[in-house]
A protein has these predicted regions:
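Acidic, polar-rich low-complexity tracts and alpha-helical solenoid repeat scaffolds
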Residues: 1-317
Length: 317
């Protein structure tokens, strides 16, 4: 619909040309066009004039609440939507936006509690579809993978371009269930950007390739996750797994493999993986009796641990 063109037409009609009933109709049509062209100030001004209009008072209350929501004033919107009575024609839609507000505020338990009942109500198709997404993502955040999969699958199947957050959540839930093929499809779909979600997606892709024993693909995915600067914890885990995949692949020379672990310790000296990495380095050199390079490796560390210093003493004496 061309709301801008319709608005120009309505603006050319003087309100004084109509009686009270028709004037209210004109004001509402103007306000509705303004809402759809994102002229929220103009829409609110006309909607406020309809508060006392018996034909449009419910419309006024609902759409004024929507104006607050569209502006991002969620506290005011929540108060206004909550004030809409249950016998109003807009009650279901108001409850939908209350769920949206809870979702934006990360009140996932509240979304699930209210959303399940609301899904049984007669909502516009677009709202019901979006409600499935919110319920699915909320269940994902609450750790309820089985419930999340049902809602998110319904959502993804109903839209042409699913939200990346929904695809990622569905992929992670499928991963937790052990359905790695579906997980790859959904998680892989969000690696088309350069952001924190894509970084996490590459980490999951690497883990799934490890399950398939596809070490080269795993290493590539881990490397991409590590090189993205967004989340340091993800970078740490990705670098550790990248080094592991390279060391297990058999195609990386021993010296290069150890160098990767050495770089890891220099970048993440306090890592939860540090002890495992130190064991790998120490055992590798001791097994090969390459004591000179063992010393060089330990001395190259910026902050060698007590374990590494003990290994150094063993080499020296």
């Amino acid at each position: 619909n061309d709301f801008a063109a319709a608005l120009r037409g309505y603006e050319g009609i003087p309100a004084s040309a109509f009686d009270a009933d028709k004037r209210g109709d004109l004001l509402f049509r103007r306000a509705f066009c303004r809402l759809n062209t994102k002229d929220y100030d103009g829409a609110a001004a006309e909607l406020r004039q309809l508060r006392a209009d018996s034909q449009y008072s419910e419309h006024s209350a609902y759409y004024l609440a929507y104006v607050d929501y569209a502006r991002g004033d969620y506290d005011s919107a929540e108060q206004a939507f909550s004030a809409i009575r249950k016998n109003s024609r807009f009650w279901g839609e108001a409850q939908f936006y209350l769920c949206q507000i809870d979702f934006k505020k990360e009140k996932y338990s509240d979304v699930v509690s209210a959303g399940k009942d609301l899904l049984d109500k007669k909502l516009p198709v677009e709202m019901a579809t979006e409600l499935n997404r919110m319920l699915g993502e909320s269940q994902y955040h609450l750790g309820n993978s089985a419930e999340a999969i049902g809602y998110l699958t319904d959502y993804v199947n109903a839209v042409d371009a699913p939200e990346r957050s929904a695809l990622f959540a569905l992929g992670v839930c499928e991963f937790r269930k052990g359905d790695y093929e579906n997980a790859k499809t959904y998680v892989g779909a969000v690696t088309d950007a350069d952001d924190v979600m894509a970084q996490s997606a590459y980490l999951f892709m690497g883990q799934m390739y490890l399950k398939d024993d596809n070490l080269n693909a795993a290493a590539l995915a881990f490397e991409k996750a590590y090189k993205m600067p967004y989340d340091e914890s993800t970078r740490e885990t990705a670098f550790y797994n990248y080094a592991l995949a390279q060391s297990r692949g058999g195609r990386t020379p021993f010296s290069s493999s150890v160098k990767l672990f050495q770089d890891f310790l220099n970048k993440f000296p306090n890592s939860r993986y540090a002890s495992n990495v130190e064991d790998y380095i120490i055992n590798s050199y001791m097994t090969s009796k390459d004591y000179d390079n063992a010393l060089l490796c330990i001395e190259a560390l910026k902050s060698p641990s007590a374990k590494m210093m003990k290994a150094k003493q063993n080499v020296l004496y």
